[in-house]
From Swiss-Prot:
SMART domains: AAA
Induction comment: Induced 1.6-fold by hydroxyurea.
Summary of subunit composition and partner proteins: The complex is composed of two ATP-binding proteins (FhuC), a transmembrane protein (FhuB) and a solute-binding protein (FhuD). FhuC interacts with FhuB.
Descriptive protein name: Iron(3+)-hydroxamate import ATP-binding protein FhuC
Enzyme nomenclature, EC number: 7.2.2.16
Keywords: ATP-binding, Cell inner membrane, Cell membrane, Ion transport, Iron, Iron transport, Membrane, Nucleotide-binding, Translocase, Transport
Top-level taxon of the source organism: Bacteria
InterPro entries tied to this protein: AAA+_ATPase (IPR003593), ABC_transporter-like_ATP-bd (IPR003439), ABC_transporter-like_CS (IPR017871), P-loop_NTPase (IPR027417), Siderophore_ABC-ATPase (IPR051535)
Subcellular location: Cell inner membrane
PANTHER family: IRON(3+)-HYDROXAMATE IMPORT ATP-BINDING PROTEIN FHUC
Residue ranges constituting the ABC transporter domain according to the UniProt record: 12-248
GO molecular function, one term: ATP binding
BP GO annotations: ferric-hydroxamate import into cell; iron ion import across plasma membrane
Length: 265
């Protein structure tokens, strides 16, 4: 197996952060340290504060109160380039990639290491090709991104994050527009990348069963408050899920011994 640099020391810590807009609190005071080198799923109902929290981690909006630390340093103390070398963010609504091939899209990930006028060298080309191979798109590297299937397109964007060589990936609903086969494809890829490279991954996920299967840790929000956190085995209990989603839910053991499977009564 090829050896990769392991980045399992990188993580975020939240100190009593909150987020408010006029007349409404979207995220109530929250303190939390995300497990380093693991996949953490942010789960909860629509409007629970998952994407708000992820955007704060990605510096797209500052907290109204409290402090966010990245590797024990205040988030605002990082320069834009240094932050991009540590953290890569994939929004739910992907920006257009019209006229770009997979290889050209993935190459954008090298921008934080050079800037707009920096030279693209042999080491960069190696990083790009490595990322394309890691996500299984080498045969499609010359194809236009717009011509790919939904799952292939999502893998191309993830390859761009890999080429960015960041230590933490922030993914906002990376499977929301995919069928179940492509959901499995993308989430298994994300989990494998985390294991092989020690990447810290924080992902907003709606499907609790997918989250339990592919995440190492779960953080549950309801109404802007964190109401549960723990391993999938700790979260996948009927009373806990009912508290998170507000409806009666049951649990069945997985026939193959994986994470338990939830269902609605």
């Amino acid at each position: 197996m090829q050896e990769y640099t392991n980045h399992s020391d990188t993580t975020f810590a939240l100190r009593n952060i909150s987020f408010r807009v006029p007349g409404r609190t979207l995220l109530h005071p929250l303190s939390l340290t995300f497990p380093a080198g693991k996949v953490t799923g942010l789960i909860g109902h629509n409007g629970s504060g998952k994407s708000t929290l992820l955007k704060m981690l990605g510096r797209h909006q500052p907290p109204s109160e409290g402090e966010i630390l990245l590797d024990a340093q205040p988030l605002e103390s990082w320069s834009s380039k240094a932050f991009a070398r540590k953290v890569a963010y994939l929004p739910q609504q992907l920006p257009p990639a019209e006229g770009m091939t997979v290889r050209e899209l993935v190459a954008i990930g090298r921008y934080p290491w050079h800037g707009a006028l920096g030279r693209f060298g042999a080491a960069d080309r190696e990083k790009v090709e490595e990322a394309i191979s890691l996500v299984g798109l080498k045969p499609l590297a010359h194809r236009l991104v717009d011509s790919l299937s939904g799952g292939e397109r999502q893998r191309a964007w993830i390859a761009m994050l890999v080429a960015q060589d960041s230590r933490c990936l922030l993914l906002d609903e990376p499977t929301s527009a995919l069928d179940i086969a492509h959901q499995v494809d993308v989430l298994s890829l994300v989990h494998r990348l985390s294991q092989e490279r020690g990447l810290t991954v924080i992902a907003v996920l709606h499907d609790i069963n997918m989250a339990a299967r592919y995440c190492d840790y779960l953080v549950a929000l309801r109404g802007g408050e964190m109401i549960a956190q723990g391993t999938p085995a700790e979260i996948m209990r009927g009373e806990t899920l009912e508290m998170i989603y507000g409806i009666p839910m049951g649990i069945l053991p997985h026939p193959a011994g994986a994470a338990p499977v939830s269902f609605v009564y």
